[in-house]
A protein has these predicted regions:
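Short alpha-helical segments and helix-capping/turn motifs at coil-helix boundaries
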Residues: 13-21, 25-26, 90, 101-107, ...
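Extracellular/luminal Protease-associated
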Residues: 1-60
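Soluble metallo-hydrolase cores and metallopeptidase-like ectodomains found primarily
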Residues: 56-142, 158, 162, 166
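Short, solvent-exposed loop/turn and secondary-structure capping segments
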Residues: 2-6, 41-46, 115-118, 130-135, ...
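Sec-exported extracytoplasmic/periplasmic mature domains
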Residues: 24-29, 33-36, 83, 155-165, ...
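Acidic/histidine-rich catalytic neighborhood of metal-dependent amide-processing enzymes
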Residues: 15, 99-102, 129, 135-191
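Generic beta-strand/beta-sheet core signal
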Residues: 34, 122-124, 172-175
């Protein structure tokens, strides 16, 4: 048994990654997060992420790894865990194509040998946009995630087009980053 405090929307995923292998080795059949006051407050941010499912770049060919389940139990409900609790889980799966593109630009280098080497500059162009209300605000403001990088890449592209480097520059603005780095995973697998 290990106690931990979850105090941010990303920490359930971090804690799972940190302790999942140890739990497997110890023969765990599941992981139960018992919230504290701080992680209770993050539930409104965490719940949509827990419901969104798994995205893969290979579509129907994607192998979804079977894993031990993870449950989130609010502290006030932890008495339910005493004795011999049982739970029934109904799992639904669906497959669909997620529309997305990678935007790629190249400025060829000036050096006859070095132009075959590439400097990769990248970011992503998607954003979640709207979420469940948090303090009556439903907008995910995306200036830094990731509009500022797109603007920076465009500015660098303009600068390099006027004064090319010795090496070629590859500009990639990935799609579907918010769905699990799909655009960058696709580009890495299919350069």
């Amino acid at each position: 048994e290990q106690e931990m405090t979850l105090f941010e929307r990303r920490y359930p995923r971090f804690i799972k990654a940190k302790y999942l292998n140890s739990a497997r080795k110890l023969g765990a059949k599941g992981i139960v997060f018992i919230t504290d006051e701080i992680s209770d407050k993050s539930w409104i941010e965490v719940e949509p992420m827990m419901k969104r499912g798994v995205y893969g770049v290979e579509g129907l060919n994607e192998n979804i790894k079977e894993d031990i389940p993870v449950f989130w139990v609010k502290k006030e409900n932890q008495n339910w865990l005493k004795g011999n609790p049982q739970i029934t889980v109904n799992l639904q799966t669906e497959t669909y194509k997620y529309p997305s593109v990678n935007i790629i630009g190249k400025i060829e280098g000036t050096d006859p040998k070095l132009k075959n080497e590439y400097v990769l500059l990248s970011g992503h162009q998607d954003h979640d946009g709207i979420r469940h209300p948090v303090k009556n605000d439903t907008i995910y403001n995306g200036a830094d995630d990731n509009a500022s990088t797109c603007v920076a890449l465009l500015a660098m592209g303009r600068a390099y087009s006027k004064q090319p480097a010795k090496r070629s520059i590859l500009f990639v603005i990935h799609g579907a980053e918010e769905r699990g780095l799909l655009g960058s995973r696709w580009h890495s697998a299919h350069p």
